[in-house]
Regions:
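Intrinsically disordered, low-complexity linker/assembly segments
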Residues: 66-210
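Post-J-domain flank of DnaJ/Hsp40 co-chaperones
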Residues: 1-60, 91-95, 199-210
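Glycine-centered tight beta-turn/hairpin loop motif at sheet-sheet or coil-to-beta transitions
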Residues: 35, 60-64, 139-141
């Protein structure tokens, strides 16, 4: 009918205009850029003292961009450092995202980090274990002397308070030394004679208690 044609022509145009305006406004809404995540490895001592580290990442334009990251002393394994506004660019005037760098603290030949405690292997000789002794142990930043009690066994742990990793409150965790009794792989003739003599005179048998 004439009325329905008029209605569709008038109100239909209004509806189309509203949809177009809505779409146009939506396109102009600022959208924040996405974050970029990456990770880097640092040593236990680097994390303990803190450092500046450079990393290079490929930017959106395809070029490499270098960032200087300040890693605070005592950072925890798995923590993330945030560089604000260094992520992907936003749209329609939106802010850029952030760059998040996860810190992986890697164990090394000296130490293994577990929480705020440092673990290290303490290798001693059978006679040191039998007689007791004093041995030097490297900790972060210093060397200390550790008393080994007479009769200590392989697998026992000696704990040194305050010589571990930073606890974030001005203190430190423990340094835990895992005792490993080592024998000479190629004993000298004299050592072999002593071992044979010990075998003859000793009544000790660790298997008696099994």
């Amino acid at each position: 009918s004439i009325f329905s044609n008029f209605f569709n022509m008038f109100f239909g145009e209004q509806t189309d205009n509203k949809e177009q305006k809505s779409k146009k406004n939506k396109e102009k809404v600022p959208i924040k850029g996405e974050n970029i995540e990456t990770e880097i490895d640092v040593s236990i001592e680097e994390a303990f003292y803190g450092l500046e580290k450079k990393i290079s990442l490929r930017a959106q334009n395809g070029k490499m961009k270098t960032f200087t990251i300040k890693i605070p002393a005592g950072i925890r394994n798995g923590e993330k450092i945030r560089l604000i506004g260094q992520g992907k660019k936003g749209e329609n005037g939106g802010k850029s995202g952030d760059l998040l760098i996860k810190i992986n603290i890697k164990d090394d030949k000296k130490y293994a980090l577990r929480g705020i405690d440092l673990y290290t292997d303490l290798k001693i000789t059978p006679w040191e274990a039998a007689l007791g002794t004093k041995v030097s142990v490297d900790t972060i930043g210093e060397t200390i002397f550790l008393h080994i009690p007479q009769g200590i066994e392989s697998g026992e742990k000696v704990k040194i308070p305050g010589k571990g990793y930073k606890d974030g409150q001005g203190g430190r965790g423990e340094l835990i030394a895992d005792v490993k009794i080592m024998i000479p792989k190629v004993p000298t003739k004299e050592e072999m004679e002593i071992f044979k003599k010990l075998n003859q005179v000793s009544t000790f048998n660790p298997r008696n208690n099994l």
